[in-house]
Amino acid sequence: MKIINLTGAALDWAVGTAMKLPPPYWADGKCANFSTDWAQGGPIIERHHIEICHLDNGEWRAQLNANQWGFHCRHYGETPLIAAMRCYVASKMGDDIEIPEAL
């Protein structure tokens, strides 16, 4: 599945997988909601220096300048957390990943 299409449980699963967490993914004693809960997604944004910007069209853009060669990952979303988590997953796993059918 293309990262640009990930939302909800599928996006949260991808974030947990990118972080190499064992399923089920837990954060603060509850099931992880990285793409909707700032307490869970915010530390990822801070730790990986993901830049977030609101665009004139209402979307959010997140980008990650990852190395000295200028490689950057850029993704968009309806919210800052969705954009940032898509960017994080793509930086770790590429722009196209396999998602379990149950999600």
Question: How would you describe each model-predicted region?
Answer:
Residues 1-103:
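Glycine-rich anion-binding surface patch
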